[in-house]
Swiss-Prot record:
The encoding gene: cinA
InterPro entries reported in the protein's UniProt record: CinA, CinA-like_C, CinA_C, CinA_KH, Competence-induced_CinA, MoaB/Mog-like_dom_sf, MoaB/Mog_dom
Protein name: CinA-like protein
Recorded family membership: Belongs to the CinA family.
HAMAP family: CinA_B
Superkingdom of source: Bacteria
Pfam families found in the cross-reference section: CinA, CinA_KH, MoCF_biosynth
SMART domains xrefs: MoCF_biosynth (SM00852)
Disulphides: none
Source organism (scientific name): Deinococcus radiodurans (strain ATCC 13939 / DSM 20539 / JCM 16871 / CCUG 27074 / LMG 4051 / NBRC 15346 / NCIMB 9279 / VKM B-1422 / R1)
Length: 404
């Protein structure tokens, strides 16, 4: 079993100024290749703390991947930290230096002297070429009493890291021979604790494993199995996956890479969809934007415009814009005024006494369904929840074949 840890270096990551998408990418890549990931750590640009974190990671793991800190400035300290832990002295590598100079010359520029540190190497490090940037990576091997330890240092920009990981790192790694297969089931309309209760003992077994995750679109359930061969792993996975599918069929809208909007598009089965939004800042239309069935949309909070789209003055006066009746009228209006086969509406309250309330409605001409959302969060969260709830409503109603 190959044990791994990820260390993300950068004060901007530590303070949340930039989302650490690289660690998520690496975690997925490792998991798909049967590597056991034990920890992910974020450290600021401090030589002492990065060195300490790296030493600790090496004491626990076989593979440590360090992301970031390979730039040319004084606060890019990953090379120095690795050298300190390895007790080796970095020195300029003539070939790397010539390569760096060539990059700048090809652009008609002179390489700044500060970039010379990007040509550093230590005796135990192999340089990893960077095809899209100026920061080479390091691939470091160290023999210990516990066996070989590997440190991989990669630059922080995702487009550089991802390409180098696939082209330079993976071919060099002693990956385990075991095969890992998995399927993720997407659900909505049920809480994570309820999903766990329904699955019962399945969530406590090891291989296949069954894990639940809360997502913006609902609760995901990942079923994974590993074995010596892919065929054996799939044979292990199949009965447990069938069991999970059966238990959660009522709430399931898709699997793996499918999106909720895509699932709605499939259920439309050639019919067109018109959308009217009020107070949602176009959140629903944005989710549907890439779907071929998405025919037209009207996004407005102007009462006069909404009345021309089907909202009655009586409803506006007596129930208000943020109401179930308003959502119903606008869903019907989406069919009529946007010339669509199916109408979907969402009305959201983000300020005032109805802040956090939202209503969505679906109208097929023969069926009308609504859903209510109460979410006392910030406006962006309320809009997001309302848009997802509208898609969930559309999927459930359409999947039921017009019977709700």
């Amino acid at each position: 079993m190959l044990l791994a840890e990820i260390i993300s270096v950068g004060t901007e990551l530590l303070f949340g100024e930039i989302v650490d998408s690289n660690a998520a990418f690496l975690a997925r890549e490792l998991g798909e290749r049967g590597v056991t990931l034990h920890r992910k750590t974020v450290l600021g640009d401090n030589l002492g703390r990065v060195s300490e974190g790296l030493a600790l990671a090496l004491s626990r793991a076989d593979l440590v991947i360090v992301g970031g800190g390979l730039g040319p400035t004084d606060d890019d300290l990953t090379r120095e930290a690795i050298a300190a832990v390895m007790q080796e002295t970095p020195a300029e590598d003539p070939e790397l230096l010539a390569w760096l100079r060539g990059l700048y010359e090809a652009r008609g520029r002179v390489m700044p002297e500060v970039n010379r540190k990007q040509a550093w190497l230590i005796p135990s490090a192999e340089a990893l070429p960077n095809p899209v940037g100026t920061a080479p990576g390091w691939f470091v091997r160290r023999q210990t009493e516990q066996g070989e330890k590997i440190i991989v240092a990669l630059p922080g920009p995702p487009r550089e890291m991802h390409k180098m990981w696939r082209e330079q790192v993976l071919p060099r790694l002693p990956l385990p021979g075991r095969a890992l297969v998995h399927t993720t089931i997407h659900t909505q309309g049920i809480g994570e604790s309820n999903v766990a209760e329904i699955l019962g003992e399945l969530t406590r077994q090891a291989n296949p494993s069954v894990a639940t995750y809360f997502r913006k679109t609902g609760v995901d359930v990942r079923v994974a199995a590993s074995a010596d061969t892919e065929a054996e792993a799939r044979a292990l996975l199949a009965p447990v996956l069938d069991d999970v599918r059966g238990k959660l069929a009522r709430w399931t809208w898709g699997e793996d890479g499918q999106t909720l909007a895509g699932a709605v598009g499939q259920q439309l089965a050639g019919r067109t969809l018109g959308v009217i939004e009020a107070g949602s800042a176009g959140a629903l239309s944005l989710l549907l934007a890439d779907e071929p069935a998405f025919h037209d949309a009207a996004v407005t909070q102007d009462h006069r415009r909404l009345i021309t789209l089907g909202l009655t003055p009586v409803t506006l006066k007596e129930a208000g814009l943020v109401s179930e009746q308003a959502a119903r009228e606008l869903a019907a209006g989406a069919r009529e005024h946007l010339a669509s086969d199916v109408g979907l509406s969402v009305v959201v309250g983000v300020t005032g006494e109805r802040a956090g309330q939202a209503y969505a409605a679906l109208d097929t001409g023969t069926l009308q369904k609504t859903v209510t959302v109460n979410w006392p969060g910030d406006p962006e969260q309320v809009r997001e929840r309302a848009a997802v709830a509208a898609l969930g409503l559309a999927f459930r109603a359409l999947a039921a074949g017009g019977e709700g």
